Amino acid sequence: MSKVYDWFEERLEIQAIADDITSKYVPPHVNIFYCLGGITLTCFLVQIATGFAMTFYYRPTVTEAFSSVQYIMTEVNFGWLIRSVHRWSASMMVLVMILHVFRVYLTGGFKKPRELTWVTGVILAVLTVSFGVTGYSLPWDQIGYWAVKIVTGVPEAIPFIGSSLVELLRGSVSVGQSTLTRFYSLHTFVLPLLTAVFMLMHFLMIRKQGISGPL
């Protein structure tokens, strides 16, 4: 085992990386409220794991979506638990994210030189809400269907381009299979990828600039 470690150490300098991580200075004013960002990350990882598990059984079609969710809840081993954890974690992620935004704002964590950290955080907040909007429609029940119809109909009030935006979101003039396919793709691929990229940027900036000081 020692030889294996030495082989990696010689090439990657693992010990130097570990020392940098473990020796980072933590200001004395930091309290439990400064952990809200990390809790949001934990919820996101839970979402990825449970969501990935459900993709094995979920069918993104208007005729089979609802029945596949029912199958997950009633037939798949621990499917009810996986989906429930996914829902609970989603709600907790939104709640903790909101608290995190308030904490950063109230403690002035958005001020110079951390403006870009704040911007990436706001983008992450928008992505988090987008997860909720797209995920809400995937069971394709009455609530999900009408929620999608209302949400995708909002841009229609925009002059000149409103109708085009609605058709772009829905994939057609009305809500249907194209809409579900779009929302499924957004929820399972586009949004997770964007969130992972912006989270990496967010944490690298925090790592570089450190935690903001007290008020």
From Swiss-Prot:
Binding of heme c, residues: C35
Binding site for heme b 2: H86, H187
Cystine connections: none
TM spans (from-to): 32-52, 90-110, 116-136, 186-206
Subcellular location: Plastid, Chloroplast thylakoid membrane
Residues that bind heme b 1: H100, H202
Keywords recorded for this protein, A-Z: Chloroplast, Electron transport, Heme, Iron, Membrane, Metal-binding, Photosynthesis, Plastid, Thylakoid, Transmembrane, Transmembrane helix, Transport
Cited PROSITE patterns: CYTB_NTER
InterPro entries: Cyt_b/b6_N (IPR005797), Cyt_B6_PetB (IPR023530), Cytb/b6-like_sf (IPR027387), Cytochrome_b_N_euk/bac (IPR048259), Di-haem_cyt_TM (IPR016174)
Keyword Plastid annotated: yes
Task performed by this protein: Component of the cytochrome b6-f complex, which mediates electron transfer between photosystem II (PSII) and photosystem I (PSI), cyclic electron flow around PSI, and state transitions.
NCBIfam families according to UniProt: PRK03735.1
Subunit field text: The 4 large subunits of the cytochrome b6-f complex are cytochrome b6, subunit IV (17 kDa polypeptide, PetD), cytochrome f and the Rieske protein, while the 4 small subunits are PetG, PetL, PetM and PetN. The complex functions as a dimer.
Annotated family: Belongs to the cytochrome b family. PetB subfamily.
Protein name: Cytochrome b6
Gene name in the database record: petB
